[in-house]
Regions:
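Membrane-embedded alpha-helical bundles that constitute the cytochrome b-like, heme-associated redox core
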Residues: 1-191
Length: 191
């Protein structure tokens, strides 16, 4: 495929965000034991910073990075999923309706995970930006915060598996390597 047949879709900041988030979440998830708390906390702060960046970039970034380019009504998302299941889904240059919904779900789940992570860090370790607000919280409440944090971390993993499955399915359906596109920024031009 030559450059004349390709179109730039993913800007460098979206690509750096995506792969940095993959790495930071993996480090945070797999360093969740007490002996790795320092690494877990740093990775969690990085995840939070990346999510906050992406929320801003969703309003001020280039066309395909903007939420306005890929947020659809739930009925449109459901119709698109039906088309995927019948192998008749149209191809999108940017995010398709299901991909847009997944981005919102992932960002929301990651934001909840990190905010509750900060709460756990403050309540159990007396550290972080919420330490003063959560000083003296009972062990049962601290445990509840930790349960919520862990639930959303695990829910995020479920979303990640669904996201990867969607990327593989779309890649096969449209004969296009979407993983490569997230590295290079380029996709095949419209048909």
């Amino acid at each position: 495929m030559n450059n004349a047949e390709q179109v730039k879709v993913w800007d460098p900041l979206v690509r750096i965000f995506h792969w940095s988030l993959v790495a930071a979440f993996a480090v945070a998830y797999f360093s969740s034991e007490d002996e790795w708390l320092g690494l877990h906390s740093v990775a969690g702060y990085i995840v939070l910073a990346l999510v906050l960046f992406r929320l801003v970039w969703g309003f001020v970034g280039p066309r395909h990075a903007r939420f306005s380019d890929f947020l659809y009504r739930p009925s449109v998302v459901m119709q698109y999923l039906k088309q995927v299941l019948s192998f008749r889904a149209p191809r999108y240059i940017g995010h398709n309706p299901a991909g847009g919904a997944m981005i919102v779900a992932l960002l929301a789940s990651l934001l909840i995970t990190t905010v509750f992570g900060l709460a756990v860090y403050g309540a159990e370790e007396g550290a972080g930006p919420l330490a003063a607000a959560l000083a003296g919280v009972s062990k049962s409440r601290a445990h509840a915060l930790e349960e919520i944090h862990e639930f959303f971390a695990n829910f995020t993993v479920v979303l990640i598996f669904a996201h990867v499955a969607g990327v593989v399915l779309e890649s096969l359906l449209h004969r296009e390597n979407l993983v490569r596109a997230m590295f290079t920024g380029y996709k095949r031009a419209g048909e």
